[in-house]
Amino acid sequence: PTGPMHMGNARGGALGDCLAACLDWAGYDVTREFYINDAGNQIQKFGKSLAIRYLQLYKGEEAVPLPEECYQGADIIARAKEFAEIHGDSYVDKDFEELKDALIADALPKNIAGLQRDLGKYRITYDVWFHESDLHKSGAVDDVIKILMDKGACYKAEDGAIMYRSAQYASKYGVVNRKKDENADGEEEAKDEVLVRANGIPTYFAADIAYHYNKLAVRGFDRAIDIWGADHHGHVARMKGAMDAVGLDGTKLDVVLMQMVNLMRDGKPVRLL
């Protein structure tokens, strides 16, 4: 939740809520859950964007330019101004990481509240708002990596990174969107995937495995149904295979892919937030 609700959130919410309502009507015990990606690179980029916009309020845009890879939206400026209204310039000379963390802590709950408010306008409510960061804080990510290591699904590379034998487990579930290398004969070979980088930081895939392990093993759901954007189609077989790798049944995870759309006006795409 690095910004206001967009069309993908809205369409995914409607699709998931309709499916949940049908299953509920059919007699299933359904829990509606929203997964909050509040860890990883996107949140770090969110914090960096906020911090730069905050510093610009006091030093100017020329002194503190916003890189192109940062979030450029007006909502980022608005959140930075809200922070400044409370704290003034007291963070201008603080360590950049401290400033970034403070802004994330201030802005993220507001964005989540905004999502909840907007979803409520078309009568969608979730029973659980699950934070990705909790998986890291609780040690759940480390636990699932240990399970994979113990089962031989992972190994430690020469540089210290922990690698996962993805293709070995994903192949039974269909086409895998994976990185490839060319071997000596010029043919493509599937590469194993990084779960923990050489610097000790887990990848997003490690957290995803821990999250689905939490649903199926820790909380004991009989079936997990995810709503994903179609651009993540290559991740389906990987995640199902990962459930097998940790000793669960990958067929208990269903993924509904939601196609992406562009809204047009006068022949031009319309940007909606």
Enumerate the language-model features and the residues they cover.
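NTP-dependent nucleotidyl-transfer catalytic core
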Residues: 1-273
